[in-house]
Amino acid sequence: MLYAFGIGEIPMSVSGISCNGDGAIGHTIRAVGAVSQALHNAQPGTIVGVRGPFGTDWNLESCVGRDLVIVAGGCGLAPVRPVIVQALAQRSRFGRVMLVAGARTPDHFLFFSEAVQWAQNPQLEVELTADSAGPDWPWRVGVVTEPLRRLTLDPPQTSALICGPEVMMRFSAQTLLEKGLMPKHIRLSLERNMQCGVGWCGHCQLGPLLLCRDGPVVGYDVAEPLLLVPEL
């Protein structure tokens, strides 16, 4: 939870973790409201409040020894970026590592230069796609489920991490189920109106879950029946 003094507090995923031991963390913030605008406009030296981290993480340890598929849509690339960096740093602990990342247009791609570097790294299999793009766009055009559907996977040995708009996550998870992955090996990062961060206020309730405590990362075996309930 990030707090802009005198304005308010918002939940925010970590998009970068320092590797030099200084404890620094990074956040990727899109200015869409009063708090995010204040944080977006903050200058070096500005003091901000930080609480957490709260809830569940991607549990990358459970993927050790397995193939790993990371699916990111839009701003969803930011929360999975530390996973990609960690998987590369510990590359020998995993089988294949695959990234499918998409955005509405090339201009909406987060960390695009870094994504291009990942695509050029022989230790990663990367598919980049934009929903719409001009003739100069060298990657795929279309939604993320299209390159995801073309992947050849070993379902019993594959884990998947998905982050992005909820509709994109549902369709991506369904694509992976059709390819034979088990729901418990597919994890999503869910969003609701998180406020307290410790499971007290109930604003982030999704059925029996309080996402600040039981999420935001949830197995699809748990999430699927909840996401099928209208207006939940």
Residue ranges and their predicted role:
Residues Y3-F5, S18, Q90, Q117, ...:
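Sterically constrained small-residue positions within well-ordered secondary structures
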Residues V167, L190-P216:
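Local cysteine-cluster metal-coordination motifs and their immediate loop/turn environment
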Residues L2-A4, V50, L206:
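A generic structural signal for residues embedded in beta-strands
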Residues M1-T46, A103-T105:
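Ferredoxin-reductase
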Residues A34-Q195:
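FNR/FR-type flavoprotein reductase catalytic core
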Residues H27-I29, V126, L188, C204:
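Preference for bulky hydrophobic residues occupying beta-strand positions
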Residues E9, N20-D22, C63, C196, ...:
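A generic fold-level signal
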